[in-house]
Design a protein with these regions (language model features):
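C-terminal domain-tail junction helix/linker
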Residues: 20, 193-197, 219-273
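Short small-residue beta-strand/loop micro-motif enriched in glycine and branched aliphatics
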Residues: 138-144, 199-202, 226-227
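Generic alpha-helical secondary structure signal
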Residues: 4-11, 29, 154, 158, ...
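RNase H-like two-metal-ion nuclease catalytic core shared by retroviral integrases
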Residues: 89, 177-179, 185-188, 201-221, ...
């Protein structure tokens, strides 16, 4: 073989017994750390979040290096790019006041909530519906509800659950939704009025007016590996419970809140109050 390769026997054996360099050893250890975090996130995290987690563990590495290693390993986040607004609808409709006017910032929790409904497909029960309530300060899903029917009760129960979970000062709370009939129904409006909650509305055909809420539903549909594979309503509800309560609120870190989880950020705000 040495003759074929035109190298000396000494060089050949030196190559066989060569020890990995320090840099190669570091890369091997780094690769394992990256794979561990990538697997723990169920392939949801890309380089920025994995880099932040490794930094928090005390590893001094650059984002570019994490990106290079992930490319070398052939792994990337299963989440696609964030939603961007499409063309605006030209349909005329009765407009209601948009109080928050695209300002999704909040100095503390339970001051601005966003809510919306999304469609969930199941193999046996067909379309089901998820209504969620998002806190603008913590990025936490403070309340949610699932139903086989899309009606005012679906929208209302999600908000009732949020109020029960958070026990907010409702007189200082704004809740923002689109203009779909579930949110403009007499039942929904009466409940908000009873608790002195101010209702803010997106302009018809402008989903970007509720962007963080839209982003959550989009993110959920990309990150839940069982999406479009739910057997029935019960199966979907269990999976969504696990995603929201076990993963999203308590384990998923967010760049907008300093790479903390929503629950940890809420706890921090509560302790600081």
């Amino acid at each position: 073989m040495c003759n074929v390769l035109k190298i000396s026997r000494a060089a050949y054996y030196k190559h066989l017994h060569r020890k990995p360099s320090r840099y190669e050893q570091e890369n091997k250890a780094l690769d394992q750390e990256i794979i561990n975090e990538y697997t723990a996130s169920k392939r949801r995290y890309g380089a920025p979040k994995i880099h932040k987690i490794l930094e928090n563990k005390g590893l001094s590495i650059s984002l570019k290096r994490v990106q290079r290693r992930m490319k070398k390993l052939g792994i990337k986040s299963i989440v696609v790019k964030k939603w961007k607004p499409s063309c605006q609808s030209k349909n005329k409709t009765v407009q209601k006041e948009n109080i928050i006017k695209g300002d999704f910032s909040a100095e503390t929790i339970n001051k601005k909530w966003l809510t919306d409904i999304t469609y969930i497909y199941t193999l046996k029960d067909g379309w089901c519906y998820l209504a969620s309530v998002f806190d603008c300060c913590s990025a936490k899903i403070v309340g949610w509800h699932m139903s086989k029917t899309i009606d005012a009760d679906l929208a209302l129960q999600a908000v009732k659950n949020a109020v029960s979970n958070q026990d907010p000062d409702t007189k200082g709370l704004i809740i923002h939704s689109d203009l779909r009939s579930q949110y403009t129904s007499n039942k929904f409006e009466k409940y908000l009025e009873k608790l002195s909650i101010k209702h803010s509305y997106s302009k018809k055909g402008y989903p970007y007016d509720n962007a963080p809420m839209e982003s959550f539903h989009s993110c959920f549909k990309k990150e839940d590996e069982k999406m479009n594979k739910y057997i029935d309503f019960k199966d979907a509800k269990i999976s969504i419970f696990e995603y929201i309560e076990s993963w999203y609120n308590r384990k998923r870190i967010h760049s907008r809140i300093g790479y903390m989880t929503p629950q940890d950020y809420e706890d921090l705000i509560t302790k600081s109050a």
